[in-house]
Amino acid sequence: MTKYARPGTADAIMSFQSRYDNWIGNEWVAPVKGQYFENPTPVTGQNFCDVARSTAEDIELALDAAHAAAPAWGKTSVAERAIILNKIADRMEENLESIALAESWDNGKPIRETLNADIPLAIDHFRYFAGAIRAQEGSLSEINSDTVAYHFHEPLGVVGQIIPWNFPILMAVWKLAPALAAGNAIVLKPAEQTPVSILHLIGIIGDLLPAGVLNIVNGFGVEAGKPLASSPRIKKIAFTGETTTGRLIMQYASQNLIPVTLELGGKSPNVFFSDVLASNDDYQDKALEGFTMFALNQGEVCTAPSRALIQEDIFDEFLAMAAIRTKAVRQGDPLDTDTMIGAQASNDQLEKILSYIEIGKAEGAKVITGGERAELGGDLSGGYYVQPTVFTGNNKMRIFQEIFGPVVSVTSFKDYDEAIEIANDTLYGLGAGVWSRDGGVAYRAGRDIQAGRVWTNTYHQYPAHAAFGGYKQSGIGRENHLMMLSHYQQTKNLLVSYAQKAQGFF
């Protein structure tokens, strides 16, 4: 066990500033109106720094810097851009513990996740896109013996990115790495609930990028996010967050006819066929862990497996074993490497989760385990903690809506057809899980479930080279994978005639 000292205390490996301005043109720039907002840590509920409360004027300053940088950056060779991305990855790796601690303190998630998942994944995404942009090729087509069509990938120019609060650094890197690799300049707005871990990161890597290529402006959605998303000075907007806000982002983008990438809500089914209990072996243990994945990152994952579907003939036995597994999840200080589940990202989210739990109880859903706020005592008593909670009910209950917390709603199904029917009975289609020892069943279920990613005999893996995105109301476009480069590029066609004679029309 390792317990990290809190930022700013004796023996701490990093400290936050007491106040953060915006990062514009590789400099710290105070908000135009001089306003700041408090930023509490979810670990204790206490404020630890103040952050720029930006407005449209600050967005304009960032756009000025981005537009000044975009032409030269877009013409930088892909080899040079790849070198810079790899340098960013190296610098992050050298400072992994510091960045992980900042992320855990700002967001509340266990440091074992930031040390072993979030930040290493972010590092790998930079390295992946450094390689992907080097490997990307244009094309040519021979129209006839004298005419050739050449196709080039060109950057869009200046793009806007709005980042969620559940994975502040990793979700930022999902967007930053391909956008930078493709040669775009960026104005990025973090979530106001988790505004500073990305600023700690930029303090580490900022000097590696030319001034103005990456600009970070903090603030609230209406005051800063809307001016960015609706600006006629951006060529694309990428957003991760709730579906309601995603609709607004689309409206703003439509006014300027610019493309959007939207990664929105989810209520992912996790389907367990009866053969998962065919033997008491490693696979069974893996499936039980797969059930408990609803509590990863405190359930604050768009693809959290928050609807568990268990086949009738194993329902009672599997649920009893899953409840034991859930009760064994260790909740505690997020800075302790033995802690498995930490704090919710904000007090508002805490209250939302608790209200849904009460709704579930009122609707008649049965609490198998959890169902209350976690009172950890001591200096954690003001933090935002919820017990991992397992409900049983049916798919029509409100607890089967997106809660975005460590809550799973469990129901049963008779056969394959009913499993698919229940799994698809949702507005969302971001992720899903299928568990079966029968490869044919697992494959068919994966194809029949309406979701952009279906984990099969696994869950919550997010490699850089696997496409991620939603069906239905879970979003538009994809993130990660080589195909993501095209989301930040436009195609230039040069149609060239090498003939000496006129075409003969006039």
From Swiss-Prot:
Its EC number is 1.2.1.3. Keywords: NAD, Oxidoreductase. InterPro entries: Ald_DH/histidinol_DH, Ald_DH_C, Ald_DH_CS_CYS, Ald_DH_CS_GLU, Ald_DH_N, Aldehyde_DH_dom. SUPFAM superfamilies: ALDH-like. It catalyses: an aldehyde + NAD(+) + H2O = a carboxylate + NADH + 2 H(+). It is an enzyme of class 1 (oxidoreductase). The keyword Glycoprotein does not apply. Pfam families: Aldedh. Induction: By EPTC (S-ethyl dipropylcarbamothioate). GO terms for molecular function: aldehyde dehydrogenase (NAD+) activity. It comes from the Bacteria. The active site is at E263, C302. NAD(+) binds at G219, F220, G221, V222, E223, A224, G225. Belongs to the aldehyde dehydrogenase family. PANTHER family: ALDEHYDE DEHYDROGENASE B-RELATED. This is EPTC-inducible aldehyde dehydrogenase. The gene is thcA.
